[in-house]
Amino acid sequence: MIPGNRMLMVVLLCQVLLGGATDASLIPETGKKKVAEIQGHAGGRRSGQSHELLRDFEATLLQMFGLRRRPQPSKSAVIPDYMRDLYRLQSGEEEEEEQSQGTGLEYPERPASRANTVRSFHHEEHLENIPGTSESSAFRFFFNLSSIPENEVISSAELRLFREQVDQGPDWEQGFHRINIYEVMKPPAEMVPGHLITRLLDTRLVRHNVTRWETFDVSPAVLRWTREKQPNYGLAIEVTHLHQTRTHQGQHVRISRSLPQGSGNWAQLRPLLVTFGHDGRGHTLTRRRAKRSPKHHPQRSRKKNKNCRRHSLYVDFSDVGWNDWIVAPPGYQAFYCHGDCPFPLADHLNSTNHAIVQTLVNSVNSSIPKACCVPTELSAISMLYLDEYDKVVLKNYQEMVVEGCGCR
């Protein structure tokens, strides 16, 4: 479980140490004067100490995020559209945007129900042709999954392949082809030349006249590679056409870039392996309903309520220089709890019996402190980011948003 209060404290401290960012939304207005005073008194000692503390704070945050070091994404890193769509569905944004986006993506309820982490992997662009029959073509390709952490238990995996419609021949509208996905069980050096030792993972009969993504279950292979630590010799794809010559086979199932195709377009059409796993911390992914962003109104001149309640605190990842590897969200409303817990405690202050007793004793004995205004309900956020290996990760982090406050 990710400690949300610790996360907020560390982000605030990082913000203090970043010098020129004191006007950012991470620090409430009431705290900015104190920050300025701290900066003024620190003098020459501040520079060396702040850099050292900042490294410690950043290391703590990265550990909370399950990262060993700060990601330094390359300019060539690509965020698959599928992962962006999953994030929008997971965070509740897609329901508001689906009419304009028109993605038609179906949320993977079953795989997500056992996972709090989704990872995506592009295949290595070295393909090995496999001898086939006159009616089929086959290729072997490889996904490097070595960046999956040891403590993450994979529950399922899927292979996504993009295929384009075939418009050749008089019967193309009624035509079908079959796509078979295999796990390669033996390396080439141990095989009889020209033959693969494989096992079938998934198969599908599809129409020629449809352009779309196809999803195949490759969980048995990925579980062997990750849980059982068996060697990863890659996957094989076989495309069989019932009424086409071999020269037309496989051209519409996109597993390699065509010469006239731009790198940007190909980056979004490459085969994609997606894993669903759980690191043992927090709850699984659950699709959220869309939430309307709260509207901020200017403070009225009337006397403010000083009792315990929730206050706005927006965490902007650009304020701590993390917007280069955190894809979404750019920030989030974390909130914080602040205010008095006066005697007698009102019902709306969401107090415990112990807090009521403590407040009662405080009313006659001031040496006993009042009950404290603290979060009573916390919720998770979803984050889409690039890890230290340039792999795209969608992850749930628990206890990041204050939903309710009370006197405890």
From Swiss-Prot:
Propeptide position ranges: 20-292
Carbohydrate-modified residues: N144, N209, N350, N365
Keyword Ribosomal protein recorded: no
Pfam families: TGF_beta, TGFb_propeptide
Stored InterPro entries: BMP4_TGF_beta-like, Cystine-knot_cytokine, TGF-b_C, TGF-b_propeptide, TGF-beta-rel, TGFb_CS
Biological processes, Gene Ontology terms: ameloblast differentiation; anatomical structure formation involved in morphogenesis; anatomical structure regression; angiogenesis; anterior/posterior axis specification; aortic valve morphogenesis; blood vessel development; blood vessel endothelial cell proliferation involved in sprouting angiogenesis
Disulfide bond annotation, renumbered to this chain: C308-C373, C337-C405, C341-C407
GO molecular function: BMP receptor binding; chemoattractant activity; co-receptor binding; cytokine activity; growth factor activity; heparin binding; identical protein binding; protein serine/threonine kinase activator activity
Domain of life of the native organism: Eukaryota
Family the entry assigns: Belongs to the TGF-beta family.
Protein name: Bone morphogenetic protein 4
Organism: Rattus norvegicus
